[in-house]
Each structure stands twice: as structure tokens, then as C-alpha cells.
Regions:
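Charge-dense, helix-prone N-terminal extensions
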Residues: 1-139
Length: 139
């Protein structure tokens, strides 16, 4: 799925969420989240935030979303420790690999996962996790 297809799919999946575009990224907030402190989902399109995923490549973007500690552990093992400088965490994953669910390069310690340019099948498999992230954001 290219970036526009993903944006369309996410807007259809979360029609009541508020999407904010800033810093070459899209931030999804649950309806009613007036303070907008933490999105439940982001889509990053450039290396401005980190270079781990090499998003400067043609057609690359990264979909990021929160998981519960149990969801994270069942997929990747224990939550890693955050770096003191909040830099890229070494989880053993190639953060530039396309269409592969993996820990987020920086926010894995907070239970975030990501996928670089997911295919349609991968996206469909992620929908339950994305909906769960949205439900948590509503509370």
C-alpha cells in the first residue's frame, strides 16, 4: 500500500478520530481527546524524527501504533529499556525492512510497534491491533 492508500484506509477505519498533520507526520487522536498529549497511531513519512527506517527511500513511510505490554511481549519479548537520550533502541530488528511488524525504533520501551510500508494483507492483519489501540485511547 502506498502512503495515500494507507491514509485513506486509516481515515475509513477511524472516521471519528482527529488527524493532525505536523512535522512531516500524521497523528491520530481519539475523538474527545482535547489535550492531544498522546496519539494512538502515527504515520511518519520522512527521516526527520529518526533515520532508523530510512524513510527517505522512494515510497517508504512508517505506520506506528501502541500495544499493551502483553501484546508487545507476545510478539517481541519483554519491553526493552529506553536509552537515556531516547535514541534508537537495539532490538535486533532491521527497522528499514518493509512489510514487517517490529518494535518501534525509539518508542519500543513504551510498547509501540511499527511497520514500514505494509502490504494490504499485513494491514488487514493489523486492523484488530489498531482498533484496540483506538479503544484504549478512548478511555
Amino acid at each position: 500500500m502506498d502512503e495515500q492508500e494507507m491514509l485513506t484506509a486509516l481515515r475509513e477505519l477511524f472516521p471519528r478520530a482527529e488527524v493532525t498533520e505536523a512535522m512531516n507526520a500524521f497523528f491520530w487522536f481519539a475523538e474527545g481527546d482535547e489535550r492531544k498529549l498522546m496519539p494512538f497511531l502515527t504515520l511518519v513519512t520522512t527521516d526527520e524524527h529518526d533515520r532508523a527506517s530510512r524513510l527517505s527511500r522512494e515510497g517508504a513511510y512508517r505506520l506506528n501504533f501502541s500495544l499493551t505490554p502483553a501484546e508487545y511481549a507476545s510478539r517481541f519479548g519483554p519491553l526493552p529499556k529506553a536509552r537515556a537520550d531516547w535514541g534508537v533502541v537495539d532490538t535486533g530488528f532491521d527497522y528499514a525492512a518493509p512489510d514487517r511488524l517490529m518494535p518501534h525504533p525509539i518508542y519500543a520501551p513504551l510498547g509501540w510497534a511499527c511497520i514500514v510500508r505494509p502490504g494490504r494483507e499485513s494491514f488487514e492483519a493489523l486492523v484488530p491491533l489498531l482498533r484496540a489501540a483506538y479503544e484504549r485511547a478512548l478511555t
